[in-house]
């Protein structure tokens, strides 16, 4: 697992483990997003802004807790519901995951290509 820092409310730094190439992490990631999709369907979309914001933030709190471990959302947000901070942390998290997937893919391709003959070399040998 790789250690990363997410920046929560009041610039608090929370160290988390993210490993997009690890099976157990992938399972937690996938299940958490499936649960989030269900929560989003039930999310109140009309009414008081304060209630909408609270529901929105709670949905992401559950996502972070389900992927990164119970209590992570409390560390990140200190029990507060701020939609902009939630969006920033989510963006930071997805950025880390995306960069890791790209890096893992590039490394895997490098390893595979090391043992795969070059297409041009195969053609010239015919």
What are these regions (language model features)?
Residues 74-126:
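C-terminal charged interaction modules
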Residues 35, 39-42, 46, 70, ...:
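Surface-exposed polar/charged interaction patches
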Residues 1-50:
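Short N-terminal mixed-charge amphipathic segments
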Residues 11-13, 35-40, 64, 102, ...:
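Intrinsically disordered, low-complexity interaction/regulatory regions of eukaryotic proteins
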Residues 62-66, 70-79:
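Mid-chain, well-packed structural core segment of small domains
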Residues 28, 32-35, 59, 63, ...:
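Charge-rich, solvent-exposed alpha-helical interaction surfaces
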Residues 42-45, 49-66:
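Negatively charged, Asp/Glu-rich surface segments that serve as flexible interaction/assembly modules
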